[in-house]
Structure formats: structure tokens, C-alpha cells
């Protein structure tokens, strides 16, 4: 949501933004983006395989040139020793490239979300070299 909000703050963004999907629950990830439930069970919702599957899912559903998937723990609760609050996976895919990275952001929930959106936008910018 925040990524799309930031993209559509730019006049003329309808030329490059067609749609976005916010999938908060594991069920939404599987139902709307075709993320395999077994992938979520095996790796957890906040994992690089799930982030990539989300990016691939939205790209396929939207018939888009680029798909972006972000999954994470913004806090203040929900973290674990293995995946503390601030753990965010960002993935982006095109027809020719797949990128995924796990970040650890610090700060309040809103700051974690902003940093995640910044990381996603930067990843896409670097992929497209713009």
C-alpha cells in the first residue's frame, strides 16, 4: 500500500502503475497471489522464498513488467529471535531478473514501513536502471 501510495503521488503515474494488492494474512498470500501454502509453512511468511513468490504472483496476475513483493514484521510485536521486529524481505522480478533481499530495519512501525518502501523502490529503480 505505501509503495503504491508513493508511486501514485507522482502526476502521470497511471502510465506505469496499473494495480497493487495488499496481502496481510497467509491466506491472502495464497488466495490472491498464488503463493503455495506449503512454501509459507516451510519457510514462514517472512522469508525470501515467500517474498519472491509474492512478486512473481502479482507480476503474473497483473500481466506486468515488474512485480514487487514485501513481507515483514513491522512491530511492535510479532518478532522472534530468528526474525526480530524490523525484519523485512523485499523482492522484485522482471521477465529476465529476480532479486530478493532480507533487511533489518530499526525504529517505530511507521519508520520500518517507510524504510521497507524505500528499499523496494530502490530495488526496482536499480533493476530498471532509472
Regions found by a protein language model. Give the residues of each.
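Short alpha-helical segments enriched in small residues
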Residues: 1-130
